[in-house]
């Protein structure tokens, strides 16, 4: 069986370009991906999409939907969205798997672009850092793992 060419990469756990450490980890991950997959298109799943101005396409992450950052730079949990996350994301994923096309009937418009990227990606990778030390009493880790 021939190896499938990696054309589309989705890079997860990109927090904010405003944080120097996060930005350095992102640059390192992008450099490694470009070396290993030079022909690929890379899309970023960003928790603070307004802060990212790089060449790669940046989309609001699932985490950004359940824990958005307001204009003042403060983030707050949207618990209703957190409860809605499971059906809103599982229906498109399972319908893609079973019927070869995603059904977005219950998916809010803000989530659809990132879910479409997940489904279209040949490779999904995560940037290092932030998984264990983020705030949210474990909710951040749960949404990243989901």
What residue ranges belong to the model's regions?
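Aromatic- and Gly/Pro-rich donor/ligand-binding loops
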Residues: 2-146
């Amino acid at each position: 069986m021939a190896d499938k060419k990696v054309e589309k990469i989705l890079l997860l756990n990109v927090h904010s370009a405003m944080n120097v450490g996060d930005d350095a980890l992102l640059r390192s991950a992008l450099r490694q991906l470009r070396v290993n997959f030079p022909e690929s298109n890379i899309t970023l799943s960003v928790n603070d999409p307004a802060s990212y101005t790089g060449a790669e396409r940046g989309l609001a992450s699932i985490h950004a939907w359940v824990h958005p950052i307001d204009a003042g730079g403060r983030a707050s949990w949207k618990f209703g969205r957190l409860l809605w996350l499971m059906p809103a994301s599982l229906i498109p994923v399972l319908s893609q798997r079973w019927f070869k096309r995603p059904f977005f009937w219950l998916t809010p418009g803000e989530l659809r672009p990132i879910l479409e990227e997940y489904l279209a990606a040949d490779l999904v990778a995560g940037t290092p850092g932030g998984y264990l030390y983020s705030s949210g009493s474990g909710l951040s880790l749960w949404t990243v793992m989901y």
